[in-house]
Regions:
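Catalytic cofactor-binding cores of redox enzymes
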Residues: 1-197
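Conserved small/polar residues in nucleotide/adenosyl-binding loops
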Residues: 200-205
Length: 206
């Protein structure tokens, strides 16, 4: 499920960081399919508990409880990535240079896009909160860097995911991340949108 995917992602980050210099980028869209895997698993658990306790639950109640537990799992998974990156030191004693890419249009369908939006929302909320240092004080972590892509679905106040853009702006005001990329401008300049933290310094593809 989603938690397992997040754990594996952090292990990959650690392995790559220990065997190379320079940065690495991950896209939250790669984690999005695992949200539905967890949803289905949690739903089965809720139905089994309902039967075991002999409590009749409506479809609406089952769906509501499933989504609540799912949200908790997404929150834990995002926290795992944040804290692992913050506490991880590479073999040369540095924190890994990790960039997290938030791009709704990488989702393969509408359900996956909604699930990706849930991960992005949680990532931004946790970054706004910050992380606790050794003294228990909430601080701004240096990594992972965040990049948020502006697109038709989130750029105007009547677009379905505009609330994420507002949350991103709030996060930038407090934590100086994320950075922003325009899907439209990037496609015009480069022909595609790249998951890279050094976007405008990379050579054009041949």
């Amino acid at each position: 499920g989603f938690s397992t995917a997040c754990n594996i992602a952090t292990q990959i980050i650690a392995q790559v960081a220990s065997s190379q210099y320079g940065g690495q980028s991950i896209s939250l869209s790669h984690l999005a399919p695992f949200v539905d895997v967890s949803r289905k698993k949690i739903r089965k658990e809720v139905e089994a508990e309902s039967e075991e306790l002999n409590i009749a639950m409506s479809e609406e109640q089952i769906a509501k409880l499933t989504e609540k537990r799912l949200h908790d799992e997404v929150s834990r998974g995002v926290q795992t990535i944040q804290y692992q990156v913050v506490t991880l030191l590479t073999t040369n004693g540095q924190a890994p240079f990790v960039t997290v890419f938030m791009y709704l249009n990488e989702a393969k369908n509408e359900q996956e896009k909604k699930d990706l939006a849930l991960i992005i929302e949680e990532t931004l909320k946790q970054r706004i909160r910050g992380v606790k240092n050794e003294d228990g004080v909430w601080i701004t972590p240096a990594f992972p860097k965040l990049i948020y892509v502006l697109e038709d679905d989130n750029i105007t106040d009547n677009s379905p995911y505009f609330y994420l853009t507002e949350l991103a702006a709030k996060c930038t005001a407090k934590r100086m991340v994320p950075d922003y990329i325009s899907e439209k401008v990037m496609k015009n300049l480069k022909g595609d949108v790249y998951t890279c933290c050094l976007l405008y310094t990379s050579p054009s593809p041949r």
